[in-house]
Amino acid sequence: MTIVAVNRCLRQKGFYKTHPEPKLLNWLDLVALGTVCDVVPLLGLNRAFVRQGLKVMAQRKNIGLKALIDKSNITEAPSAFHLGYVLGPRINACGRVGEAALGNKLLCASSEFEANFLADKLNAFNDQRKEIEAYVLLKAIEILEGSPQEYPIAFVSGHDWHQGVIGIVAGKLKERYNVPAFVMSIEADEVKGSARSIAGIDLGALIIAAKEQGLLTKGGGHTMAAGFSLEEDKLDAFKKFAGEYVKSRLGEEKIVPVLEIDGRLSVSGATPALADSLSELEPYGSGNTEPRLMLTNVQIKKASIVGSGHVRCFLSGDNGGSIKAMAFRIADTELGQALLNSGGGLYN
């Protein structure tokens, strides 16, 4: 909207009498990319911008985006999913483990040669980011599961863990254990950390309180995420402070995650026609989440591990119909093991 206002002001002042006026609609692909990757609620104007931006992106006018889409093996028209989970992570990867300016250079590329070269570099940085992230996540899980945990938090640190991935790892630990997660990289001169929270715990308030206690040198954030710095000799004190803070607000009861369901569905009702109907409600994202439907009276005919810890299931319904299903990155979790050992059981 700022660009629209500036454009209107320039027009009113006669600037475009001597300069070509840009067609702002042609830039909506970048607006859509930024809106989705910044997790802006897809409501009102933002939803309209993303919906139209995806149409512009499908026209492949931006040479850099076109190259990145092709290098990412996206063969269908881009969706909000592709922006948030395929293209966005590749652009962000160069800032996490490479050169932050490369993402901007790609989006401003003026030749196909330059665009393809930069897209290849972004893909390489993204692969590197995945490897670093997997290593830090593995070490963090080993620490957490290698000893009893006194507090309802996931609190881990390691020497020279890459700062570009600790936020991602914190998010995955939060999802895995359903507790607030704090992940820190111990550097030569200070400790830098990132945290992710669950409902009911305001991380921003926690960080402010810790700074007031002299435990952190820097820090800030909002309810669900925060970043901070501290001296290494304050790690134990900060862990105790954060643990007591969370414990006092959650109480002694075990945290039980809540899965909200939008509707029930039989296996025979899971059809391409239904998927097409639901696609009319896109773009999905923050503020307009995809419908979550629960399959009832399902028999797991077969379950097996595929890829990097994914579980593929073959399901059948009591009134006919069969479908394939995939559960991503859960093979080593309690749910993954339950699926793999289901033995053809019927689930209501």
Q: Predicted segment positions?
A:
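Active-site cavity-forming subdomains of large catalytic enzyme subunits
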Residues: 1-16
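Hydrophobic helix-and-loop "lid/oligomerization" segment in the mid-to-C-terminal part
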Residues: 14-15, 19-235, 240, 305
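Mid-to-C-terminal polyanion-binding domains and interfaces
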Residues: 114-118, 125-156, 201, 209-348
